[in-house]
C-alpha cells in the first residue's frame, strides 16, 4: 500500500517539510545508542559502519587496466580516477554486484540500475524517476554514461565525485528510502559473500566508504561509451558518416576530416552546439539556463537548479534555473531530455534551441534563435544519433549473479530493473 506523503524537498541528511527542517531520528542518534532490538554490546557504532581503518594483510586484489573505447581519453589517475580509489578488478566486480542489488533500498525494490539501466542509455527513459513505494521524483534521471570524466554529479552539480554521488540516493526518501546510511551498511553486512569481498578488496568489513568506492569504480569503467560512427569517421573512416550526419556535424560546430572531399553547403556552427557540448565527452561540465521549467504566469522557476546547490548567502542569480550540460554521447538512447524530462525527443530538443529557449531573467546569453531550416535541424539530430557508442555494454552482459542472504535467499536483480508500480 502506498504511503501517504507530504510534498518535500530533499537535501542530504535533512528534509525540508513545510518550511521546517526535520532531522530523521536515526541521524540524531548518538554513537552509543543501540539499534532497536539490539543490546549496546552487539551494536557497531555509526562511525565504524561508515568508515573502518583497513587491514592491508587481508587485501588480495589486482589493478584493473582499462583501455577506453575509440574517441575517449585515458582514465588518468590524476584527472579522472582519484588517487584514493584506484581501479582494481575486485572493486569493479564488487561494485557491479552492489549496483544491481536491490538490498541497498529500504524495501528491496530499487537498485541503482532501476533508474540507471545500461540498456536505456544508463537512465530509465522516464520523464522523472520512480523510487520506493512508487514515489516519483521531480527530476529526470541523469545518464551515467562517461561520468568517469565528470567534474561534478547530478543535474545541479551538488556532489564533486562519483564516490560522494553514490551515497545520496540511498537516503533519498523518494529513491531508495533509507532513513540513514547505517541501516544500508548493516543490511549488506548480513550477506556473507559481501563480507568476504570487502575483506579482500579493502581489508575491512562492509562500510559505506567501501560501498561508494566500489560503485564509483564500476560506473567509471562499465559506463564508458565511445567508438561511435563519429569516432570512426574522426579516425579516418570517411564513409562512416552519411552526408546528412556530416552536414549535422558541421552545423553542430565541428569541422570535417581533412581528407574528406565532401563539401556541405551549410554554415559552420550555425546550431551553436559546441558553445556547451565540447571535448571528447561533448560537455563543458558547466551550468546553463535554457528556460526549461520557467513558469511565466508565476514568474519563477519550477526548479531553481544550480542555485539550490550553492551555499545559502552565496547564491548567484545567474545560477537560477541553470543545469549541468549533459553529454551528447548516447543521447539517442537516454530520452526524454532536460532536467525535468519535458522534451520527449531530440527533435523537440532542437525545436527548443531553434526558438532560442524560453525567455526568463536568467536565460543564458547564448540562447538566441538559430534560424535553422527543418532540414538543418534534422541533420543535427542525425549527427547526435551518430554519437551512439558501438562498444557499450548491455544490461545482460553486466547483470551479475547476486550473493545470497544468510538464509539462502537471492534477490532478483532483473526484477529490480523495473521501477516500482510499473
Named regions from a protein language model:
Residues 34-168, 228-344, 348-354, 358-361, ...:
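Short glycine/threonine-rich turn/loop motifs
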Residues 148-151, 166-170, 188, 192, ...:
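Generic hydrophobic/packing signal
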Residues 173-178, 187:
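A gly/proline- and charged-residue-enriched helix-loop-helix capping module
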Residues 2-14:
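N-terminal Sec-pathway targeting helices
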Residues 181-225, 332, 342-422:
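C-terminal capping alpha-helices of c-type cytochrome domains
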Residues 22-36:
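Signal peptide processing junction and immediate N-terminal pro/mature segment
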Residues 12-22:
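Hydrophobic membrane-insertion alpha-helices, especially the h-region
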Residues 2-3, 205-210, 260:
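Short amphipathic alpha-helical segments with coiled-coil-like heptad repeat character
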Amino acid at each position: 500500500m502506498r504511503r501517504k506523503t507530504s510534498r518535500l524537498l530533499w537535501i542530504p541528511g535533512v528534509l525540508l517539510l513545510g518550511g521546517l527542517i526535520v532531522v530523521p531520528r536515526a541521524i540524531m542518534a548518538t554513537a552509543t545508542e543501540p539499534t532497536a532490538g539490539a543490546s549496546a554490546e552487539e551494536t557497531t557504532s555509526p562511525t565504524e559502519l561508515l568508515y573502518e581503518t583497513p587491514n592491508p594483510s587481508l587485501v588480495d586484489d589486482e589493478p584493473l587496466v582499462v583501455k577506453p573505447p575509440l574517441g575517449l581519453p585515458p582514465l588518468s589517475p590524476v584527472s579522472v580516477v582519484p588517487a584514493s580509489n584506484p581501479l582494481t578488478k575486485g572493486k569493479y566486480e564488487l561494485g557491479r554486484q552492489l549496483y544491481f542489488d536491490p538490498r541497498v533500498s529500504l524495501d528491496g525494490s530499487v537498485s541503482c540500475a532501476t533508474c540507471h539501466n545500461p540498456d536505456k542509455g544508463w537512465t530509465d527513459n522516464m520523464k522523472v524517476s520512480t523510487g520506493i513505494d512508487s514515489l516519483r521524483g521531480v527530476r529526470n534521471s541523469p545518464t551515467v554514461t562517461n561520468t568517469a570524466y565528470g567534474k561534478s554529479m547530478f543535474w545541479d552539480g551538488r556532489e564533486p565525485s562519483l564516490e560522494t554521488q553514490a551515497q545520496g540516493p540511498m537516503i533519498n526518501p523518494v529513491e531508495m528510502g533509507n532513513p540513514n546510511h547505517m541501516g544500508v551498511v548493516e543490511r549488506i553486512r548480513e550477506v556473507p559473500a559481501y563480507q568476504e569481498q570487502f575483506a579482500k578488496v579493502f581489508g575491512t568489513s562492509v562500510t559505506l566508504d567501501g560501498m561508494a568506492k566500489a560503485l564509483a569504480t564500476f560506473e567509471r569503467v562499465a559506463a564508458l561509451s565511445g567508438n561511435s560512427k563519429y569516432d570512426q569517421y574522426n579516425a579516418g573512416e570517411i564513409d562512416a558518416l552519411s552526408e546528412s550526419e556530416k552536414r549535422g556535424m558541421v552545423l553542430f560546430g565541428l569541422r570535417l576530416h581533412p581528407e574528406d572531399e565532401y563539401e556541405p553547403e551549410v554554415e559552420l556552427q550555425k546550431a551553436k552546439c559546441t558553445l556547451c557540448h565540447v571535448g571528447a565527452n561533448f560537455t563543458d561540465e558547466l551550468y546553463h539556463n535554457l528556460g526549461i521549467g520557467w513558469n511565466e504566469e508565476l514568474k519563477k522557476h519550477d526548479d531553481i537548479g544550480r542555485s539550490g546547490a550553492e551555499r545559502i548567502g552565496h547564491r548567484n542569480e545567474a545560477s537560477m534555473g541553470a543545469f549541468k550540460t549533459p553529454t551528447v554521447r548516447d543521447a539517442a538512447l537516454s530520452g526524454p531530455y532536460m532536467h525535468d524530462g519535458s522534451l520527449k525527443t531530440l527533435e523537440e530538443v532542437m525545436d527548443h534551441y531553434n526558438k532560442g529557449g524560453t525567455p526568463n531573467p536568467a536565460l543564458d546569453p547564448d540562447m538566441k534563435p538559430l534560424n535553422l531550416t527543418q532540414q538543418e535541424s534534422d541533420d543535427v539530430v542525425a549527427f547526435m544519433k551518430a554519437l551512439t557508442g558501438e562498444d557499450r555494454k548491455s544490461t545482460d552482459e553486466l547483470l551479475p549473479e547476486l550473493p545470497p542472504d544468510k538464509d539462502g535467499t537471492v534477490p532478483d536483480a532483473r526484477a529490480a530493473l523495473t521501477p516500482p508500480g510499473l
